[in-house]
Amino acid sequence: MKKLSILMMLCLCVCLGYAQQVTLQEVATGAYRAEGIYGIKPMLDGEHYTQISRDGKKIVKYSFKTGQEVGTVFDVETARDCTLKRFDDYIMSPDETKILIQTETKPIYRRSFTAVYYIFNVRNNTIEPLSDGGPQQVPLFSPDGNQIAFVRDNNIYLVKLLFGNSESQVTKDGKFNHVLNGIPDWVYEEEFGFNRAFDFSADGTMLAYIR
């Protein structure tokens, strides 16, 4: 028993001798922070993902299996009638036939921002503004991809893509710091960690929102 105890103590001493010393500086600067992959969006087929190119001009398609580029979904230089030089982000429609291209992003609070969005038709390679009425917030495709709801100046708007992108105003009483439709105020955004307060029903016929 005495020999076993001595052996265990020797092993412990050896392990401690090789142990890595962690400094406060390393912890404070994130030296041991877990690495991650950011900015990738999986596609419906489960085999590919998309990502913005380094120059901010393309949405590039990659293979999960190989990690290699396999195609380009959107390119500001080849899309028809596109005047954009670059873009900030994008939102795919549920069926991936349309993409909302986000430009001119301006922060409001930590998670909220306004931006100018464009609708890109993947099949036709065409692009057009989501709205001509000014920057938008938190645009959302309906489940069938035929409608887009968004907030502007504290009111909710609806764009129907099957009817010539006709735009209608859903709420009309929005007022800065008084009445907010479809978006949280600063406190709720901070405490609950969200920036959109509306959603479509599963069949896309109704819109629920917080006021």
Where are these regions (language model features)?
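Beta-propeller folds
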Residues: 8, 19-211
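Sec-dependent N-terminal signal peptides
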Residues: 4-14
